[in-house]
Amino acid sequence: MVDLQEKQCTIVKRNGMFVPFDRNRIFQALEAAFRDTRRIDDHMPLPEDLENSIRSITHQVVKEVVQKITDGQVVTVERIQDMVESQLYINGLQDVARDYVVYRDDRKAHREKSWQSLSVIRRCGTTVHFNPMKISAALEKAFRATDRIEGMTPDFVREEVNALTQKIVAEIEERCSQQDSRIDIEQIQDIVEQQLMVVGHYATAKNYILYREARARVRDNRVEDQIVEEAPSEETFEVLSKDGSTYMITHSQLLARLARACSRFPETTDAALLTDMAFSNFYSGIKESEVVLACIMAARANIEKEPDYAFVAAELLLDVVYKEALDRSRGDEDLEQVYRDHFKRYIMEGDSYRLNPELKNLFDLDALANAMDLSRDLQFSYMGIQNLYDRYFNHDDGRRLETPQIFWMRVAMGLALKEQDKTYWAITFYNLLSTFRYTPATPTLFNSGMRHSQLSSCYLSTVQDDLVNIYKVISDNAMLSKWAGGIGNDWTAIRATGALIKGTNGKSQGVIPFIKVTNDTAVAVNQGGKRKGAVCVYLEVWHLDYEDFLELRKNTGDDRRRAHDVNTASWIPDLFFKRLQQKGSWTLFSPDDVPGLHDAYGEEFERLYEEYERKVDSGEIRLYKKVEAEDLWRKMLSMLFETGHPWMTFKDPSNIRSAQDHTGVVRCSNLCTEILLNCSETETAVCNLGSVNLVQHILDDGLDEEKLSETISIAVRMLDNVIDINFYPTKEAKEANFAHRAIGLGVMGFQDALYKLDISYASQEAVEFADYSSELISYYAIQASCLLAKERGTYSSYKGSKWDRGLLPIDTIQLLANYRGKDNLQMDTSVRKDWEPIRSLIREHGMRNCQLMAIAPTATISNIIGVTQSIEPTYKHLFVKSNLSGEFTIPNVYLIEKLKKLGIWDADMLDDLKYFDGSLLEIERVPDHIKHIFLTAFEIEPEWILECASRRQKWIDMGQSLNLYLAQPDGKKLSNMYLTAWKKGLKTTYYLRSSSATTVEKSFVDINKRGIQPRWMKNKSASAGIVVERASKTPVCSLEEGCEVCQ
């Protein structure tokens, strides 16, 4: 049934004439296309399903046409064919759509070769095909504007437009016949104006002139007004699409695209600048992907000048994601509906894309689709989207299947699989994740909702002094690494070089060759093809092979006794530091001669160690080595500075303060030194990580405690769910995780939070903020675990734990003080909150998780959500970060905001930052109070970083990935730094940072202004006499920019 509104519609033909709209023409065109593609003869009836499809598509196109005409838009034959094409794709009829496109292209080529084809000479000298429809459209617009017409165009106007168009086209044809079928665009515009005035439409002529001057374009119906004045510099390039077809792109078209990407930042970004930069890299036949890349690179190049360009680049990359996953662009009107429909189709077809098959049956997909907030896609900066695109989005044969919100929802669904009300909790989890309040660790993001849901971050295992077990652990490493886990191995039990092997009566080669095999296994097995596998090997400092162990990462020496790819860490008992203080000796043993020593700690370790030393003196133990503690310490520090390894971790505080001291011993930490759990031959310790984003919980006057409480409650629930959903590559890992249910809740964006509060990291205020924020996180994490225990029950090994004995993390400091003595422990023990309600909850309900808190490095997830890593100070205010997704310029957005307010952010300031390697201290025009707030990592005295870490450690039941910074070689300062870390009660340390592998590009620094003679200058110049004194070059740690496994 054709309604009255449809009968009143008219469209513009290719000759520029208005004609009545006829839906039958659409039906007939579709029928012809179906018959041609499906090889159905004209005399044969169409199958019922095909006829229904044609009617449905016709109805959708008619509905869209009528709506646009009702809205006052001009609809052309070409636009209707675009709609038909779009509907064929939406309805999954790609084969018909493809043939229809080919048919249209053939017809277009035929028209352009016809006698009616005329050429228009543009101002830039290029020619384009003359299109009468554009004259009709421009005339109608002018009449509508003059007569203030709303809704459909009246018949008398259409008749006048048709008559005028015929006269204009006739005159153009007449002139072209005298000018070799070509006419200048100025002549066309003159003819239009002349004809309007000849017939007496003076007001319309005036509006048309204004219309031309304003260079208006009819964007809504995708018609470029050929009569509108063209820019003299307009260039055109042919672009090659992925499917092999080509199209033309102009400077103004690219400007329109980039203007949309810049529209959120009109005051700080310049679309014209980006257009010029991108267009300068174009060439005829440029690939479509290269067009996008040129635009993104133009935006990237300006990030150092204006951080908002990071969001412009992100929006451009988002368009790539949308086209790849949804076959849509960001500006498409139907994007939102296609987005939601694609999500539901993606989940329903998930079996083909490695998704967990349960997802499609256990959730209300309509509710989940409607819960997605697409505007949250715009929260990401460029580096965040690039990381997601490269490594996190699920893909099929190189094509991304996910967008940011679909990615978050897939993760949320995977974490809600064991909930009773799955849809409710999936939406709750999604809202927390997609607003950047909390982010799970990378393995969870990789694998949640997938068929193999290995979601755990960290695995800790101990190697027995047995060949079968040695290779079993190496094999386990491969399996764990395959599914994106980071691994810590304890190798202390392996007998030392020269020890007797009773079975063969031979001598052992020691632990080093086995670590070499471990190294090569880590290299061979990458993490699901997404990032490098990674292992950290631990050795206690009394092991006879320890001195060789120190040199594993050296670049010189016998390469058969080097392990360049694994990380190494020293497991140091307190007794070693006591001997160091006493300037005493230290004895190295083979583990098979000192049974029980590795499992002992505190006073028991001291008793056993001294007993074994007496056996050395009596001759009972013959394989040993005595060294001066100071000499060994000096070698430890030397290797740490030269190679960045072995990291220093502390055995006694890790065990004495462990909540699980009743079930075993902590023998090592994990890959990133924040996890401290028992492991044994029968148990591989497992921990699941996630981090709270402090930035999202900052108010003007401090932390939003209510919001933080809610975030932590939901986050702990997610982390606990991981344990039950997880895919376990080994039996030992599964048994340990189910028995103890350890989770590691951490933080990120600590430095950003300080910036928002105008606090310097090197201040007592920062120390107090570290203390208070950690206390709140500890308080609400313990509370959440208690409430989960009430709902789900305690973990199975709860009985006898410190929790069960009424000891909270804050209480265990006294246990450590009792063993060490007050001179060797300098930890604050003050509290702000009333902890009695938490103690009461534990007594009543117990705990769901044996351990709760650990601060991971968050190297990758902090990049995704755009905050500073973990608890790290700002590295530099302008630097280049390298990871598997490439190199990214990282400016300090908080600093730039401050400098803008002071009116001193300009090209010279950027030049200064580059010249001074991202530091403010030597830039005279920066006020001192700004310099103090914005100290970089190497400018902050280590005491501040260590005191902040100590305040956190009093509340944390595990550890923290704590990097330390040393700007210049200074053995005494380095020694004091690590001795202070021990005395402050820290359990572990992480990297020692001495310098960076990547720096900011300085090729544009003004050497004349700096007064420096470049090396290539052969002749003596006025600047040749300048003496530039530079600090001696420090050794460069062969470190990566950040941990790429835990987070």
From Swiss-Prot:
The active site is at N670 (proton acceptor), C672 (cysteine radical intermediate), E674 (proton acceptor). CDD domains: RNR_I. It holds the Pfam family Ribonuc_red_lgC. One of its GO terms (cellular component) is ribonucleoside-diphosphate reductase complex. Its EC number is 1.17.4.1. The record marks Y990, Y991 as: Important for electron transfer. Substrate binds at T442, S457, C458, G486, N670, L671, C672, T673, E674, P857, T858, A859, T860, I861. Residues 9-111, 118-219, 237-327 form the ATP-cone domain. It is an enzyme of class 1 (oxidoreductase). Gene3D superfamilies: 3.20.70.20. It catalyses: a 2'-deoxyribonucleoside 5'-diphosphate + [thioredoxin]-disulfide + H2O = a ribonucleoside 5'-diphosphate + [thioredoxin]-dithiol. SUPFAM superfamilies: PFL-like glycyl radical enzymes, R1 subunit of ribonucleotide reductase, N-terminal domain. The record marks C1043, C1046 as: Interacts with thioredoxin/glutaredoxin. One of its GO terms (biological process) is deoxyribonucleotide biosynthetic process. Under complex allosteric control mediated by deoxynucleoside triphosphates and ATP binding. The type of nucleotide bound at the specificity site determines substrate preference. It seems probable that ATP makes the enzyme reduce CDP and UDP, dGTP favors ADP reduction and dTTP favors GDP reduction. GO terms for molecular function: ATP binding; ribonucleoside-diphosphate reductase activity, thioredoxin disulfide as acceptor. The record marks D465, R495 as: Allosteric effector binding. Disulfide bonds join C458-C687. The keyword Oxidoreductase applies. The record marks C458, C687 as: Important for hydrogen atom transfer. NCBIfam families: NrdE_NrdA, PRK07207.1, PRK12365.1. Belongs to the ribonucleoside diphosphate reductase large chain family. Provides the precursors necessary for DNA synthesis. Catalyzes the biosynthesis of deoxyribonucleotides from the corresponding ribonucleotides. Tetramer of two alpha and two beta subunits. PANTHER family: RIBONUCLEOSIDE-DIPHOSPHATE REDUCTASE LARGE CHAIN, RIBONUCLEOSIDE-DIPHOSPHATE REDUCTASE LARGE SUBUNIT. This is Ribonucleoside-diphosphate reductase subunit alpha. It comes from Chlamydia muridarum (strain MoPn / Nigg). The gene is nrdA.
